[in-house]
Amino acid sequence: MKEALEAALREILGPGEVVALRRLPGGASKEAWAVDYRTGEALHPLFLRRAGGGVIYSKTLALAEEFRLLQVAWAHGVKVPEPLHYFPDLEGREAFLMRRLEGETIGARVVRRPELARARETLPQAMAEELAKIHALSPDEVPFLQPPSLPSWRAALEEAYRDLDALGEPHPALEWGLRWLLDHPPRELPPVVVHGDFRVGNLLVDGEGLVAVLDWEFAHLGDPREDLAWPLVRAWRFGEDGKRLGGVGEVGPFLERYNALTGRDIAEEELFWWE
Protein backbone atom coordinates (compact mmCIF):
# COMPACT_ATOMS: atom_id res chain seq x y z
CA MET A 1 0.00 0.00 0.00
CA LYS A 2 2.86 2.38 0.82
CA GLU A 3 4.25 2.21 -2.71
CA ALA A 4 0.86 2.89 -4.32
CA LEU A 5 0.30 5.87 -2.04
CA GLU A 6 3.73 7.30 -2.78
CA ALA A 7 3.22 6.97 -6.53
CA ALA A 8 -0.03 8.95 -6.35
CA LEU A 9 1.29 11.54 -3.91
CA ARG A 10 4.33 12.30 -6.04
CA GLU A 11 1.93 13.43 -8.77
CA ILE A 12 -0.15 15.53 -6.35
CA LEU A 13 2.34 16.95 -3.85
CA GLY A 14 5.71 16.40 -5.50
CA PRO A 15 8.63 14.06 -4.78
CA GLY A 16 8.63 12.66 -1.28
CA GLU A 17 7.93 9.59 0.81
CA VAL A 18 5.32 8.18 3.15
CA VAL A 19 6.96 8.37 6.58
CA ALA A 20 4.00 7.08 8.61
CA LEU A 21 1.05 4.86 7.79
CA ARG A 22 -1.21 3.64 10.58
CA ARG A 23 -4.71 2.24 10.67
CA LEU A 24 -7.07 4.10 12.97
CA PRO A 25 -9.62 2.39 15.25
CA GLY A 26 -13.30 2.25 14.36
CA GLY A 27 -14.88 2.11 10.94
CA ALA A 28 -17.40 -0.72 10.70
CA SER A 29 -17.65 -0.68 6.90
CA LYS A 30 -14.74 1.59 5.87
CA GLU A 31 -11.10 1.51 6.89
CA ALA A 32 -9.48 4.72 8.13
CA TRP A 33 -5.74 5.33 7.85
CA ALA A 34 -3.54 8.22 8.94
CA VAL A 35 -0.85 8.94 6.38
CA ASP A 36 2.11 11.30 6.79
CA TYR A 37 3.89 12.29 3.56
CA ARG A 38 7.12 14.26 3.61
CA THR A 39 8.35 16.46 0.78
CA GLY A 40 11.66 18.02 1.72
CA GLU A 41 11.07 19.95 4.95
CA ALA A 42 7.27 19.87 4.64
CA LEU A 43 5.14 17.21 6.32
CA HIS A 44 1.67 16.63 4.86
CA PRO A 45 -0.86 15.00 7.23
CA LEU A 46 -3.35 13.00 5.17
CA PHE A 47 -6.32 10.71 5.73
CA LEU A 48 -7.07 7.58 3.70
CA ARG A 49 -10.60 6.20 3.53
CA ARG A 50 -10.68 2.66 2.12
CA ALA A 51 -13.50 0.20 1.50
CA GLY A 52 -13.80 -2.45 4.17
CA GLY A 53 -15.14 -5.95 4.03
CA GLY A 54 -18.86 -5.24 3.88
CA VAL A 55 -21.71 -2.78 3.65
CA ILE A 56 -23.69 -1.74 6.73
CA TYR A 57 -26.47 0.03 4.83
CA SER A 58 -27.34 -0.54 1.19
CA LYS A 59 -28.03 3.13 0.44
CA THR A 60 -24.61 4.44 1.37
CA LEU A 61 -22.62 6.03 -1.42
CA ALA A 62 -19.82 4.16 -3.10
CA LEU A 63 -16.43 5.66 -2.30
CA ALA A 64 -16.10 7.00 -5.85
CA GLU A 65 -19.40 8.85 -5.39
CA GLU A 66 -18.46 10.12 -1.94
CA PHE A 67 -15.15 11.39 -3.31
CA ARG A 68 -16.88 13.20 -6.18
CA LEU A 69 -19.37 14.78 -3.77
CA LEU A 70 -16.51 16.00 -1.60
CA GLN A 71 -14.86 17.52 -4.68
CA VAL A 72 -18.05 19.40 -5.51
CA ALA A 73 -18.58 20.51 -1.91
CA TRP A 74 -14.95 21.68 -1.64
CA ALA A 75 -15.22 23.61 -4.90
CA HIS A 76 -18.28 25.46 -3.61
CA GLY A 77 -16.76 26.45 -0.30
CA VAL A 78 -18.28 23.87 2.02
CA LYS A 79 -15.99 23.17 4.97
CA VAL A 80 -14.75 19.67 4.14
CA PRO A 81 -11.29 18.10 4.13
CA GLU A 82 -9.68 18.76 0.76
CA PRO A 83 -10.15 15.65 -1.42
CA LEU A 84 -6.89 14.75 -3.16
CA HIS A 85 -7.02 11.44 -5.02
CA TYR A 86 -9.33 8.51 -5.74
CA PHE A 87 -7.97 4.95 -6.08
CA PRO A 88 -10.25 2.56 -8.02
CA ASP A 89 -8.11 -0.29 -6.71
CA LEU A 90 -5.78 0.08 -3.75
CA GLU A 91 -4.70 -3.46 -2.96
CA GLY A 92 -8.05 -4.83 -4.06
CA ARG A 93 -10.36 -2.14 -2.68
CA GLU A 94 -11.36 1.36 -3.70
CA ALA A 95 -10.12 4.24 -1.56
CA PHE A 96 -9.53 7.96 -1.53
CA LEU A 97 -7.11 10.41 0.07
CA MET A 98 -7.88 13.76 1.65
CA ARG A 99 -6.16 16.27 3.89
CA ARG A 100 -6.11 15.34 7.58
CA LEU A 101 -7.44 18.10 9.79
CA GLU A 102 -7.11 18.54 13.54
CA GLY A 103 -10.01 18.81 15.94
CA GLU A 104 -12.56 16.95 18.03
CA THR A 105 -15.44 14.83 16.74
CA ILE A 106 -16.61 12.90 19.82
CA GLY A 107 -19.97 14.42 20.67
CA ALA A 108 -19.78 14.01 24.45
CA ARG A 109 -16.56 16.02 24.43
CA VAL A 110 -17.82 18.67 22.04
CA VAL A 111 -20.81 19.50 24.26
CA ARG A 112 -18.86 19.56 27.56
CA ARG A 113 -15.13 20.25 27.24
CA PRO A 114 -14.23 23.68 28.70
CA GLU A 115 -11.70 24.33 25.95
CA LEU A 116 -14.52 24.04 23.38
CA ALA A 117 -16.78 26.62 25.04
CA ARG A 118 -16.06 29.20 22.33
CA ALA A 119 -16.82 26.64 19.64
CA ARG A 120 -20.19 25.88 21.22
CA GLU A 121 -21.10 29.55 21.03
CA THR A 122 -20.36 29.71 17.32
CA LEU A 123 -21.62 26.29 16.23
CA PRO A 124 -25.33 27.14 15.72
CA GLN A 125 -24.49 29.88 13.22
CA ALA A 126 -21.74 27.84 11.58
CA MET A 127 -23.98 24.78 11.22
CA ALA A 128 -26.64 26.90 9.54
CA GLU A 129 -24.09 28.40 7.17
CA GLU A 130 -22.71 25.02 6.11
CA LEU A 131 -26.17 23.55 5.57
CA ALA A 132 -27.10 26.54 3.43
CA LYS A 133 -24.06 25.87 1.24
CA ILE A 134 -24.74 22.12 1.08
CA HIS A 135 -28.38 22.64 0.11
CA ALA A 136 -27.29 25.06 -2.63
CA LEU A 137 -25.15 22.44 -4.40
CA SER A 138 -26.42 21.64 -7.87
CA PRO A 139 -27.77 18.10 -8.31
CA ASP A 140 -26.48 18.31 -11.90
CA GLU A 141 -22.92 18.11 -10.54
CA VAL A 142 -23.69 14.91 -8.63
CA PRO A 143 -25.96 12.97 -11.03
CA PHE A 144 -25.52 9.74 -9.07
CA LEU A 145 -27.82 11.27 -6.43
CA GLN A 146 -31.18 10.37 -7.92
CA PRO A 147 -34.36 12.26 -6.99
CA PRO A 148 -36.85 10.26 -4.94
CA SER A 149 -39.70 8.67 -6.89
CA LEU A 150 -42.11 9.83 -4.17
CA PRO A 151 -42.34 13.08 -2.23
CA SER A 152 -39.39 13.15 0.17
CA TRP A 153 -41.56 12.89 3.27
CA ARG A 154 -43.44 9.88 1.88
CA ALA A 155 -40.23 8.11 0.85
CA ALA A 156 -38.75 8.64 4.33
CA LEU A 157 -41.90 7.36 6.01
CA GLU A 158 -42.14 4.26 3.82
CA GLU A 159 -38.52 3.45 4.60
CA ALA A 160 -39.29 3.73 8.32
CA TYR A 161 -42.23 1.33 7.86
CA ARG A 162 -40.01 -1.17 6.03
CA ASP A 163 -37.38 -1.01 8.78
CA LEU A 164 -40.04 -1.57 11.43
CA ASP A 165 -41.59 -4.49 9.55
CA ALA A 166 -38.16 -6.09 9.19
CA LEU A 167 -37.89 -6.39 12.98
CA GLY A 168 -40.47 -9.17 12.90
CA GLU A 169 -42.07 -8.21 16.21
CA PRO A 170 -44.79 -5.75 17.25
CA HIS A 171 -43.93 -2.23 18.38
CA PRO A 172 -47.33 -0.55 18.81
CA ALA A 173 -45.96 2.77 20.07
CA LEU A 174 -43.78 3.12 16.98
CA GLU A 175 -46.67 2.05 14.75
CA TRP A 176 -48.85 4.72 16.35
CA GLY A 177 -46.15 7.34 15.84
CA LEU A 178 -45.70 6.46 12.18
CA ARG A 179 -49.45 6.53 11.67
CA TRP A 180 -49.60 10.03 13.14
CA LEU A 181 -46.89 11.15 10.73
CA LEU A 182 -48.81 9.62 7.83
CA ASP A 183 -51.99 11.45 8.87
CA HIS A 184 -50.16 14.78 9.27
CA PRO A 185 -47.89 15.08 6.21
CA PRO A 186 -45.62 18.12 5.91
CA ARG A 187 -45.83 20.56 3.04
CA GLU A 188 -43.71 19.53 0.09
CA LEU A 189 -40.46 21.32 -0.64
CA PRO A 190 -38.25 20.90 -3.73
CA PRO A 191 -35.52 18.30 -3.14
CA VAL A 192 -31.97 19.47 -2.49
CA VAL A 193 -28.63 17.79 -1.87
CA VAL A 194 -28.99 16.50 1.69
CA HIS A 195 -25.97 15.49 3.79
CA GLY A 196 -28.01 12.75 5.44
CA ASP A 197 -26.20 12.58 8.80
CA PHE A 198 -25.59 16.22 9.73
CA ARG A 199 -25.13 16.38 13.51
CA VAL A 200 -22.70 16.90 16.35
CA GLY A 201 -20.43 13.87 16.16
CA ASN A 202 -20.00 14.24 12.41
CA LEU A 203 -18.59 17.75 12.73
CA LEU A 204 -14.89 18.38 13.31
CA VAL A 205 -14.55 21.12 15.92
CA ASP A 206 -11.61 22.97 17.46
CA GLY A 207 -11.35 25.73 20.05
CA GLU A 208 -12.56 28.37 17.61
CA GLY A 209 -15.46 26.55 16.03
CA LEU A 210 -16.44 24.33 13.12
CA VAL A 211 -13.50 22.99 11.12
CA ALA A 212 -15.17 20.53 8.73
CA VAL A 213 -18.31 18.55 7.95
CA LEU A 214 -17.49 14.83 7.83
CA ASP A 215 -19.11 11.49 6.93
CA TRP A 216 -20.95 12.11 3.68
CA GLU A 217 -21.83 8.52 2.82
CA PHE A 218 -25.57 9.00 3.50
CA ALA A 219 -25.96 11.98 1.15
CA HIS A 220 -28.99 11.96 -1.15
CA LEU A 221 -31.58 14.22 -2.72
CA GLY A 222 -34.32 15.00 -0.26
CA ASP A 223 -36.16 17.54 1.85
CA PRO A 224 -33.91 20.21 3.42
CA ARG A 225 -35.75 19.76 6.71
CA GLU A 226 -34.16 16.32 7.06
CA ASP A 227 -30.79 17.95 7.68
CA LEU A 228 -32.26 20.73 9.81
CA ALA A 229 -34.08 18.32 12.13
CA TRP A 230 -31.53 15.52 12.47
CA PRO A 231 -29.14 17.40 14.81
CA LEU A 232 -32.12 18.06 17.11
CA VAL A 233 -32.69 14.38 17.91
CA ARG A 234 -32.13 13.75 21.61
CA ALA A 235 -29.49 11.08 21.00
CA TRP A 236 -27.30 13.72 19.36
CA ARG A 237 -27.45 16.08 22.35
CA PHE A 238 -25.13 13.76 24.28
CA GLY A 239 -26.81 14.35 27.63
CA GLU A 240 -27.21 18.13 27.22
CA ASP A 241 -30.94 17.80 26.62
CA GLY A 242 -31.72 21.40 27.54
CA LYS A 243 -29.94 22.54 24.37
CA ARG A 244 -32.07 21.13 21.61
CA LEU A 245 -29.61 21.83 18.82
CA GLY A 246 -27.06 19.09 19.29
CA GLY A 247 -26.45 19.88 22.95
CA VAL A 248 -24.78 23.17 22.00
CA GLY A 249 -27.52 25.74 21.42
CA GLU A 250 -31.07 26.71 20.62
CA VAL A 251 -32.96 26.06 17.42
CA GLY A 252 -34.23 29.60 16.86
CA PRO A 253 -30.96 31.37 15.94
CA PHE A 254 -29.81 28.36 13.91
CA LEU A 255 -32.99 28.27 11.83
CA GLU A 256 -33.18 32.04 11.50
CA ARG A 257 -29.67 32.13 10.05
CA TYR A 258 -30.43 29.26 7.66
CA ASN A 259 -33.61 30.93 6.39
CA ALA A 260 -31.79 34.24 5.91
CA LEU A 261 -29.09 32.59 3.82
CA THR A 262 -31.39 30.41 1.70
CA GLY A 263 -34.47 32.57 1.34
CA ARG A 264 -36.60 29.74 2.72
CA ASP A 265 -39.27 30.26 5.36
CA ILE A 266 -39.07 27.04 7.36
CA ALA A 267 -40.69 27.32 10.79
CA GLU A 268 -39.36 25.56 13.87
CA GLU A 269 -42.66 23.69 14.24
CA GLU A 270 -42.08 22.02 10.87
CA LEU A 271 -38.98 20.28 12.16
CA PHE A 272 -40.90 18.18 14.70
CA TRP A 273 -42.24 15.95 11.91
CA TRP A 274 -38.74 15.17 10.66
CA GLU A 275 -37.19 14.95 14.12
Place the predicted regions along the sequence by residue.
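Catalytic-loop of the protein kinase fold
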Residues: 193-195, 200
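All-alpha amphipathic helical-bundle segments outside canonical DNA-binding/catalytic cores
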Residues: 147-148, 265-275
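Active-site activation/catalytic loop segments of kinase-like enzymes and analogous catalytic loops
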Residues: 226-263
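Juxta-kinase regulatory segment immediately upstream of eukaryotic protein kinase catalytic domains
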Residues: 1-14
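ATP-binding pocket architecture of kinase catalytic cores
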Residues: 22-155, 162-176, 185-190
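Activation of the activation-loop gatekeeper triad in protein kinase-fold domains
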Residues: 214-219
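Conserved protein kinase catalytic-loop anchor
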Residues: 191-193, 211
